[in-house]
């Protein structure tokens, strides 16, 4: 599906699929749970899902003769960390706009984790007061203008690389990769669980799995707390991406499965249930999930298993998208483990 698109390699290649046997047994043993470890996909600044997306964005950045990658996210954005790492790798400058998406209680929140890594990577880091939104950000547009004004050649990468024209392609590739691994495993996954915020990871998976009719088996767990806007953005990105890859079938609104029950109390703030899911996964599998994204999707998957959402015998693939560095910004929350 992606043969005609230029790709700049930023990842090691195939990411491993690991059975979460102890977690599955703890939850009753009626389903099998696996994780695809996108958190282990690269040596670039701890890796993560954004690199898979950026592989299809960076060729255009290089071709445009840009000298500065400019992007936006929250203070503990995984995406901005990844863009900073990629800029260092390809020899470009980097300007990161960090908006105040999360009302945090930890005094070192803006000095540890992802933002610390971005500073170490040499990015110009800018903190602004604008609040959370998944759309095009005014602060980011201002930064692009300022780079031009000082003689630079900026390349615009939106939040999560999601509404970039090629933002959905990487996770079409994820689905293709899973299909190849399923042949090796000797079975196909019945459901795929993924965290959804800016939407292109979910959208790309939806398009990729639509090739074999499994688009509604991609279960998005909303972590944005703006589900209507997020669902609309997933559908928009998916339809655009389907056109790019010539899927050959129309995607319906109902193809976007987005569960809204796990983003509470708001973006970037973990509920008690999310914290417990993070602890449970860590203590049963040694797998670290973060309070912003993966902790919420892990909580969602655990709750769905416990409620019987997945039929007995189902094989579930949890997409671990990375993000563990953000947990450093929640030291007070997890001060006692």
From Swiss-Prot:
A single MF term (Gene Ontology): D-cysteine desulfhydrase activity
Assembly and oligomerization: Homotrimer.
Record organism: Mesorhizobium japonicum (strain LMG 29417 / CECT 9101 / MAFF 303099) (Mesorhizobium loti (strain MAFF 303099))
Cofactor(s) required for function per UniProt: pyridoxal 5'-phosphate
Keywords: Hydrolase, Pyridoxal phosphate
Protein purpose: Catalyzes a cyclopropane ring-opening reaction, the irreversible conversion of 1-aminocyclopropane-1-carboxylate (ACC) to ammonia and alpha-ketobutyrate. Allows growth on ACC as a nitrogen source.
Family assignment from sequence similarity: Belongs to the ACC deaminase/D-cysteine desulfhydrase family.
Gene this chain is encoded by: acdS
Entry's Gene Ontology BP terms: 1-aminocyclopropane-1-carboxylate metabolic process; amine catabolic process
Enzyme Commission designation: 3.5.99.7
Pfam families: PALP (PF00291)
Gene3D superfamilies for this protein: 3.40.50.1100
Catalytic activity field: 1-aminocyclopropane-1-carboxylate + H2O = 2-oxobutanoate + NH4(+)
The protein, known as: 1-aminocyclopropane-1-carboxylate deaminase
């Amino acid at each position: 599906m992606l043969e005609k698109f230029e790709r700049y390699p930023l990842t090691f290649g195939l990411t491993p699929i690991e059975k979460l046997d102890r977690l599955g047994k703890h939850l009753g043993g009626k389903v099998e749970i696996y994780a695809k470890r996108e958190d282990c996909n690269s040596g670039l600044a701890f890796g993560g899902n954004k690199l898979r997306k950026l592989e299809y964005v960076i060729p255009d950045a290089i071709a445009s003769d840009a000298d500065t990658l400019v992007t936006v996210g929250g203070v503990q954005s995984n995406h901005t960390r990844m863009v900073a790492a990629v800029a260092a790798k390809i020899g470009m400058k980097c300007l990161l706009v960090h908006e105040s998406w999360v009302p945090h209680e930890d005094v070192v929140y803006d000095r540890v984790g992802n933002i610390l890594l971005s500073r170490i990577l040499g990015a110009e880091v800018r903190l602004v007061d604008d609040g959370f939104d998944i759309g095009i950000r005014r602060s980011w547009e201002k930064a692009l203008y300022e780079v031009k004004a000082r003689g630079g050649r900026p390349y615009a990468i939106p939040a999560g690389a999601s509404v970039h024209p090629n933002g959905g392609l990487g996770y079409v590739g994820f689905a293709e990769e899973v299909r190849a691994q399923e042949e090796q495993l000797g079975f196909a996954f019945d459901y795929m669980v993924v965290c959804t915020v800016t939407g292109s990871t979910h959208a790309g998976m939806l398009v990729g799995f639509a090739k074999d009719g499994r688009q509604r088996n991609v279960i998005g767990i909303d972590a944005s707390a703006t589900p209507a806007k997020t669902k609309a953005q997933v559908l928009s990105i998916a339809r655009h991406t389907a056109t790019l890859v010539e899927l050959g079938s129309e995607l319906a609104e109902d193809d976007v499965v987005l569960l809204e029950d796990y983003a509470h109390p708001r973006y970037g703030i973990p509920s008690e249930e999310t914290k417990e899911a993070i602890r449970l996964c860590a203590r049963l599998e040694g797998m670290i999930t973060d309070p912003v994204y993966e902790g919420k999707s892990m909580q969602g998957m655990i709750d769905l298993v416990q409620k019987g959402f997945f039929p007995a015998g189902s094989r579930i693939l949890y997409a671990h998208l990375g993000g563990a560095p953000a947990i450093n910004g929640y030291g007070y929350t997890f001060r006692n483990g």
